[in-house]
Amino acid sequence: MVHEAPHASSFQMLLQLLLLLLLRAEPLRSAELTFELPDNAKQCFHEEVEQGVKFSLDYQVITGGHYDVDCYVEDPRGNVIYRETKKQYDSFTYKTEAKGVYRFCFSNEFSTFSHKTVYFDFQVGDEPPILPDMGNRVTALTQMESACVTIHEALKTVIDSQTHYRLREAQDRARAEDLNSRVSYWSVGETIALFVVSFSQVLLLKSFFTEKRPVNRAVHS
């Protein structure tokens, strides 16, 4: 008879409980998008939000120009509740005072030739507890429940870190490609200039060693 190790059985139970809790948890209403913003252009997004609900907006310019963009948020009445100009990145959190469609816009109208790539993450509402009635419980969490909560928080941290590093990698790659293009153009320009200078020197040296013979003209009387 083969006996299963106690720690292996506990680990399987922990995974099953964590899976059930993740399936029961209601996700946040969120939108995560990376889009192109041409020069002299503005892009707006709309989201209907209930009254008394908190929403948050995080954005960052990945590529283009000085990595800056104008951003503003309007409530359903048309009042501007957030406005920033030429920001590389920022975060904004707001608790709604009225139900309706909220609009947030990104503007690149101040730029005449710089094409931008913008990332934003828009979340509505608070994250529900991973365990039911977690805030109203009288008894303490069991060891397995505490482990599930810890794993859930660690997974959230991993997701946030991956998003951060993915944006940093995209931004660094864009800068490296831009630098590579500039170095390539500079190298081509130097090559052409070197060729022109070398050809001019050859012609100049050739003129030094070319014998100039006087032309004798016969004078007829």
Swiss-Prot record:
Keyword Transmembrane: yes
Listed InterPro entries: Emp24-like, GOLD_dom, GOLD_dom_sf
Motif (COPI vesicle coat-binding): 208-221
PROSITE patterns, alphabetized: GOLD (PS50866)
Compartments reported by the entry: Endoplasmic reticulum-Golgi intermediate compartment membrane; Golgi apparatus, cis-Golgi network membrane; Golgi apparatus, Golgi stack membrane; Endoplasmic reticulum membrane
Signal peptide residue numbers: 1-25
Sequence ranges on the Lumenal membrane side: 28-184
Residue ranges crossing the lipid bilayer per the database entry: 185-205
Keyword terms: Cytoplasmic vesicle, Endoplasmic reticulum, Golgi apparatus, Membrane, Methylation, Protein transport, Signal, Transmembrane, Transmembrane helix, Transport
One Pfam family, short name: EMP24_GP25L
Segments carrying motif COPII vesicle coat-binding: 208-209
One GO cellular component term: endoplasmic reticulum membrane
Domain GOLD: 42-124
Chain ranges on the Cytoplasmic side, renumbered to this chain: 206-221
Keyword Translocase: no
Listed SMART domains: EMP24_GP25L
Positions bearing Dimethylated arginine: R103
Subunit structure comment from the entry: Monomer in endoplasmic reticulum, endoplasmic reticulum-Golgi intermediate compartment and cis-Golgi network. Interacts (via C-terminus) with COPG1; the interaction involves dimeric TMED3; however, there are conflicting reports on the interaction. Interacts with GORASP1 and GORASP2.
Annotated function: Potential role in vesicular protein trafficking, mainly in the early secretory pathway. Contributes to the coupled localization of TMED2 and TMED10 in the cis-Golgi network.
Family: Belongs to the EMP24/GP25L family.
Protein name: Transmembrane emp24 domain-containing protein 3
Protein source organism: Mus musculus
